[in-house]
Amino acid sequence: MAAGAPPSSRGGPVGAHDAQVRARIAALAADGTVDAGAATATWRTACAAAPWTGAPVWLHGDLHPANLLARGGRLAAVIDFGVLGTGDPACDMLPAWTLLTAASRELFRAAADVDDATWLRGRGWGLHLGLGAVHVYRRTNPVLAATGRHAIVEAVADHAGA
């Protein structure tokens, strides 16, 4: 499907980021930002999901609200192609946790038509990038930090409700 295309830095196994995610969970739990137990359980489930075995597919890799432009309540454009490449489509499930709520997430999942393992890995990407946004931006960019907090809350709640 994407033969010869460059791999995305976010197209590999979500579990490859285990050390960084666990360190961020610990750091953010220390100041009360996250529940370490719930976040770790969410992360473990994502890492235990079956890996992507299909052909690499094109992916944006950074589909969070600041990169999704809307007009009249509808998606009008996608911007910031800095991590564009190929790999596991799970990373592009990111809007399910960075943008949506439980009710709208179900509609997104149905439209995306992905298997359970891809969804679980996608949830892991949501948690990972949410933790990263809070860690990096909480003092400098309140909008991205809020997106990160939303992703963490939604990923953990989605895991708890699964």
Language model features by range: what are they?
Residues M1-G37, A50, G54-P56, T86:
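A cross-family kinase active-site recognition segment
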Residues Q20-R24, D92, A133:
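A general alpha-helix detector
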Residues A36-C47, W119, R123:
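Short, well-structured alpha-helical segments
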Residues A38, W58, A146-T147:
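Alpha-helix N-cap and coil->helix boundary residues
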Residues W43-M93:
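Active-site acidic catalytic loop and adjacent metal/ATP-binding pocket
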